[in-house]
Amino acid sequence: MKKQLLMGTVLLVASSQVWADAASDLKQKLAGVSLFSAKFAQTVYDSKGKELQRAGGDLLVQRPNRFNWHTTSPDESLIVADGKDVWVYDPFVEQVTALKMKDAVLNTPFVLIAGNDNSLWKNYDVTQEGDVYTVTSRNQDELIASFRITFDRQNNISRFDVKEAQGQWSEFTLSNFNRKPVLKGNEFVFKIPKGVALDDQR
């Protein structure tokens, strides 16, 4: 009985150390890409692996908590985070939804990429296989069950996968990754176009 208890304790300590090393390594790599732009190609699958949809566009991220996510195909949409609020714009229906940043991404692992709040890491488990890191939520009520980030040899983010709690998942492949994009100063500012309805949920 004592041997089993000791073995269990050793395994627990070992697994905790592996998690700590993986989380620390991931945090270090993310800190190295505090600003980047890229093109993305998204493929959405159902829980059985059947392809449901494809999309593509441009992504710009500046930590902490600023990003510009512009989907250009098959339909245009825009998500802009200015550090405080998140704006979700659908040109087709001429409506924009405004959300508090903490409400929009706090309960998703994406906050680990966009943000720099170290206290949030305690809500997730991190495992590592080579340059692939899997971030799993400890909260069973979250919409996103896990988030997988893949880095290339230059430590650029080459891909990330999002698995929802219901089983549907999306894979995002990044190309034209640029750590030094030229900013004009308005990339993370959203101005409501004339005639567009505002759904303010802040």
Swiss-Prot record:
Signal sequence residues: 1-20
InterPro entries xrefs: LolA/LolB/LppX, OM_lipoprot_carrier_LolA-like, OM_lipoprot_carrier_LolA_Pbac
GO biological process: lipoprotein localization to outer membrane; lipoprotein transport
Record's subcellular location: Periplasm
Family affiliation: Belongs to the LolA family.
Alphabetized UniProt keyword annotations: Chaperone, Periplasm, Protein transport, Signal, Transport
Pfam families, per the entry: LolA
Protein name: Outer-membrane lipoprotein carrier protein
Organism (species): Aeromonas hydrophila subsp. hydrophila (strain ATCC 7966 / DSM 30187 / BCRC 13018 / CCUG 14551 / JCM 1027 / KCTC 2358 / NCIMB 9240 / NCTC 8049)
Disulphide linkage map: none
Chief localisation class: periplasm
Summary of the function given for this chain in its UniProt record: Participates in the translocation of lipoproteins from the inner membrane to the outer membrane. Only forms a complex with a lipoprotein if the residue after the N-terminal Cys is not an aspartate (The Asp acts as a targeting signal to indicate that the lipoprotein should stay in the inner membrane).
Quaternary structure and interacting proteins, as annotated: Monomer.
A GO CC annotation given for this chain: outer membrane-bounded periplasmic space
Gene3D superfamilies: Lipoprotein localisation LolA/LolB/LppX (2.50.20.10)
